[in-house]
Amino acid sequence: IRRVARDLAEEVQRITQGLVHTNRVRLDHAATEITLAVRKPSAATVTAARALLAGRGPDQLRSWTEIQARDHLLLAEYPDSLQIPLQIFRIGNLHVAQWPGEIFAETGLELKQAQPRGTLFNISLANGWFGYIPPPRQHALGAYETWPLRNSLLETNAIPKLHSAFNQLIHQLP
């Protein structure tokens, strides 16, 4: 741990030596909301979940299958779509994209690479939590972040739509 701390301190010192202090920096902000569909369980999944959980309360669920079935029942009651808030701040030439969920690293990197003006970094879990928001190709791989439960409820094409909205916000900034 001492070696890591030393390496980190040396890197911070190296970077801060090149910083130029200014007391005047431009601040800008843009925000929007977009509507995304909720991935709801099928009627057959809801029927199977009800049968599995018949007569049992939430404190009686013991297996992952039972917990997942309960989540299917809860998700079935969600609205068909949700309003997703997005914000971007600009501090000088630094842009801060605020995602209301947990994005994958590749998603943040793609938005950074598409940024035409200045530097960009991403903040997840800002202004809400709409679960994991995996890119479309991750859904085919089937990891837990993609399971259609309350922790990953947005449509499979959410990331391209969010990227597009963020790019529009970036271009709205003066």
What are the residue ranges of the model-derived segments?
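Non-catalytic substrate/cofactor recognition surfaces at enzyme active-site rims
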Residues: I1-P174
